[in-house]
Amino acid sequence: MNSVGEACTDMKREYDQCFNRWFAEKFLKGDSSGDPCTDLFKRYQQCVQKAIKEKEIPIEGLEFMGHGKEKPENSS
């Protein structure tokens, strides 16, 4: 699947490959000692955010695209 920004598509594929490799070769085998794809994700995230702004796509709460951020607690 392509990214929201054409310029971001290669970054998305690179991140997807990195994540899938890490998930299959490390995480599923019990090694959760780190995510080697963090820098790729951050670059891809910035590219997508820029594309969304350039295309003037109205998205409330763009901060949901954070990596490793805690989810806000629900007030039930």
Swiss-Prot record:
Metal-binding found in the keyword field: no
Domain CHCH as annotated: residue spans: 5-55
GO BP: apoptotic process; cellular response to UV; DNA damage response, signal transduction by p53 class mediator; intermembrane lipid transfer; mitotic G1 DNA damage checkpoint signaling; negative regulation of apoptotic process; negative regulation of intrinsic apoptotic signaling pathway in response to DNA damage by p53 class mediator; negative regulation of release of cytochrome c from mitochondria
Catalyzed reaction equations: a 1,2-diacyl-sn-glycero-3-phosphate(in) = a 1,2-diacyl-sn-glycero-3-phosphate(out)
Annotated motif Cx9C motif 1, positions: 8-18
Positions in coiled-coil regions: 1-52
Keyword annotations from UniProtKB, A to Z: Acetylation, Apoptosis, Coiled coil, Disulfide bond, Lipid transport, Mitochondrion, Transport
Entry-linked InterPro entries: MDM35_apoptosis
PROSITE patterns (UniProt xref): CHCH
CC annotations in GO: mitochondrial intermembrane space; mitochondrion; nucleoplasm; nucleus; protein-containing complex
Paired cysteines (S-S): C8-C47, C18-C37
Location of this chain's protein in the cell: Mitochondrion; Mitochondrion intermembrane space
Molecular function (Gene Ontology), one example: p53 binding
UniProt-annotated site: Important for interaction with PRELID3A, residues: F27, F41
Induction, as annotated: In p53/TP53-dependent manner in response to low levels of DNA damage. Not induced when DNA damage is severe.
Record motif Cx9C motif 2, residues: 37-47
Principal subcellular localization: mitochondrion
Chain's role: Involved in the modulation of the mitochondrial apoptotic pathway by ensuring the accumulation of cardiolipin (CL) in mitochondrial membranes. In vitro, the TRIAP1:PRELID1 complex mediates the transfer of phosphatidic acid (PA) between liposomes and probably functions as a PA transporter across the mitochondrion intermembrane space to provide PA for CL synthesis in the inner membrane.
Family indicated by similarity: Belongs to the TRIAP1/MDM35 family.
Description of how the protein assembles with itself and partners: Monomer. Interacts with APAF1 and HSP70. Forms a complex with PRELID1 in the mitochondrion intermembrane space. Interacts with PRELID3A.
Name the UniProt record assigns to this protein: TP53-regulated inhibitor of apoptosis 1
